């Protein structure tokens, strides 16, 4: 067997292989034996069908299996003979068997880019203070108070932070909005007894603030220009008129900061115990935020340290994934682009730059893992899969089979490895606390 690997500067390598006829004949004979042992053909007992009939009946299938087997052998031999070669994927081969049975194949491989790791220990990062202040606890208490505030009826004009209970109907160009656009528009058509907080941007820009100063029984026509990001494309940029009548004004009543308040928020606890629990929770959140800040700064600095060629096919796959994610985010946020093709075209360049940075960091982290002998154990992988199964309320064995069937186990392993390498780098980083 002859194997030749020619590495190119664009993260590809050409594999050329030739396997002599005597080797291919032995492989062919092994495949024929395998088919003969399993074949069930009319008129013959299992395993007793003449090989000449087997070769004729399954000629196409055995030829394909032989070529696949020979190519796999060529690939594994290439990796054995070139231990420093890091192959991401083998391209579909151009392969053939000549009349004498000699096998030849040529394949373009995508390989990991070659680069020298920069100094990755002692990366300087700046993080916020981990101290939880009394002001932090007070802010958390106020947020909880807002969540359980009550709204009581008042006999006065609506003010900011009040709630106005309104009836409204909506028109476009003098017609009911659904009639004007020719389809239902849901909530925008109108509502009776709608609670509306009197502040900007809770519903549509300028709508809620226009209720300020109105008393129960007052009516007002409120004109709003629909934003260009609105999910109903027919309404973007249009002026809608909301014919609103205030039925009732309610004032926000915040609870007193006492033990009764604490009991509502955290049953069985008094105010001091609630403050202690909040302080512990805030400390945990700050610790997580600091770890995230360290990891973000380290990856950004790693990406800026080196510039090297990346496999174009891998970049394109990453770009595709990023664009898919951006489209899903736009749709889930209610800002679906009117022209999806134009959206993709405009987002592609930004996605490509993001993809290149992601991949540079990925390959560098993989190299750090190899140098520092960082690996993911089978128990760590199992624990993560079990955690995901619990989170998704799935049977563990069924979930494992699902991951294996969909080829997602490797991705989970890589995510865990990336996290372990980043954890290693954060421990090795030079950390400065920003006291501001």
UniProtKB/Swiss-Prot annotation:
GO terms (BP aspect): 'de novo' cotranslational protein folding; cell division; chaperone-mediated protein folding; protein transport; protein unfolding
Protein name per Swiss-Prot or TrEMBL: Trigger factor
Gene transcribed to yield this protein: tig
Catalysis: reaction(s): [protein]-peptidylproline (omega=180) = [protein]-peptidylproline (omega=0)
Function of the protein: Involved in protein export. Acts as a chaperone by maintaining the newly synthesized protein in an open conformation. Functions as a peptidyl-prolyl cis-trans isomerase.
Similarity-based family: Belongs to the FKBP-type PPIase family. Tig subfamily.
Listed Pfam families: FKBP_C (PF00254), Trigger_C (PF05698), Trigger_N (PF05697)
Enzyme Commission no: 5.2.1.8
SUPFAM superfamilies assigned to the protein according to its UniProt record, in alphabetical order: FKBP-like, Triger factor/SurA peptide-binding domain-like, Trigger factor ribosome-binding domain
Organism: Akkermansia muciniphila (strain ATCC BAA-835 / DSM 22959 / JCM 33894 / BCRC 81048 / CCUG 64013 / CIP 107961 / Muc)
Subcellular location: Cytoplasm
């Amino acid at each position: 067997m002859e194997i030749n690997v020619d590495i190119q500067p664009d993260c590809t390598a050409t594999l050329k292989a030739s396997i002599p006829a005597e080797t291919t004949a032995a492989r062919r004979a092994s495949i024929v034996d395998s088919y003969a042992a399993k074949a069930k053909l009319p008129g013959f007992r299992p395993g007793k069908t003449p090989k000449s009939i087997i070769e004729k009946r399954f000629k196409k299938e055995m030829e394909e299996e032989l070529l696949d087997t020979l190519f796999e052998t060529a690939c594994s031999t290439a990796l054995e003979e070139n231990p420093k070669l890091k192959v991401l994927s083998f391209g579909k081969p151009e392969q053939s068997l000549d009349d004498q049975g000699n096998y030849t194949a040529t394949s373009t491989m995508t390989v990991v880019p070659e680069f020298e790791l920069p100094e990755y220990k002692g990366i300087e990062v700046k993080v916020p203070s981990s101290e939880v202040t009394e002001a932090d606890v007070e802010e958390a208490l106020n947020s909880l108070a807002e969540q359980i505030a009550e709204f009581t009826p008042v006999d006065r004009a609506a003010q900011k932070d009040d709630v106005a209970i309104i009836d409204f109907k909506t028109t476009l160009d003098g017609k009911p909005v659904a009639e004007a656009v020719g389809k239902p528009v849901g909530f925008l058509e109108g509502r009776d007894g709608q609670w509306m907080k009197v502040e900007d941007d809770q519903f549509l820009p300028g709508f809620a603030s226009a209720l300020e100063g109105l008393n129960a029984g007052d009516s007002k026509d409120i004109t709003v220009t629909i934003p260009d990001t609105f999910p109903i494309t027919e309404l973007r940029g249009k002026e809608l008129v909301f014919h609103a009548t205030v039925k009732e004004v309610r004032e926000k009543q915040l609870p007193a900061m006492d033990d009764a308040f604490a009991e509502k928020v955290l049953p069985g606890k008094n105010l001091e115990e609630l403050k202690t629990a909040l302080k512990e929770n805030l400390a945990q959140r700050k610790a997580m935020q600091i770890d995230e800040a360290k990891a973000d700064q380290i990856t950004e600095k790693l990406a800026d340290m080196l510039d090297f060629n990346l496999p174009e096919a891998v970049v394109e796959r990453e770009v595709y994934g990023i664009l898919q994610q951006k489209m899903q985010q736009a749709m889930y946020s209610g800002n679906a682009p009117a022209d999806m093709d134009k959206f993709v075209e405009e987002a592609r360049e930004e996605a490509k730059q993001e993809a290149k940075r992601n991949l540079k960091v990925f390959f560098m982290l993989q190299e750090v893992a190899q140098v520092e002998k960082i690996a993911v154990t089978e128990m760590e992988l199992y624990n993560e899969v079990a955690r995901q199964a619990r989170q998704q309320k799935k049977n563990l064995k069924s979930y494992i089979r699902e991951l294996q069937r969909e080829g997602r186990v490797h991705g989970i392993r890589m995510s865990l490895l990336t996290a372990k390498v980043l954890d290693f780098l954060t421990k090795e980083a030079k950390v400065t606390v920003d006291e501001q």
